[in-house]
Amino acid sequence: MKNQFVLLLLAIVFLQMIFQSDAILSAIWSGIKSLFGKRGLENMDKFDELFDGDLSEADLDFLKELMR
């Protein structure tokens, strides 16, 4: 009974490793494809202005209005 339980645990661990490595490899492959794809070599600096980490006074006022 103990041997069966140990074999079951090992099988679960190995299957989990296989599925997780498959997900990681597919994510890496899609990243490589996007780098060398048609749009992958474009200049992506235009997206740097989309995120502004600082909150201005007007932003804080707007958030206060939303929370009322």
Curated annotation (Swiss-Prot):
Its main location: secreted. Residues 1-23 form the signal peptide. It is found in: Secreted; Target cell membrane. It comes from the Eukaryota. The non-amidated UyCT3 does not show antimicrobial activity. The keyword Membrane applies. The modification Phenylalanine amide is found at residue 36. The keyword Magnesium does not apply. Expressed by the venom gland. One of its GO terms (biological process) is defense response to bacterium. One of its GO terms (cellular component) is extracellular region. Belongs to the non-disulfide-bridged peptide (NDBP) superfamily. Short antimicrobial peptide (group 4) family. Antimicrobial peptide that inhibits the growth of Gram-positive (S.aureus, MIC=10 uM) and Gram-negative bacteria (E.coli, MIC=15 uM and P.aeruginosa, MIC=6 uM). It also shows 35% of hemolysis when 15 uM are tested (95% at 50 uM). This is Antimicrobial peptide UyCT3.
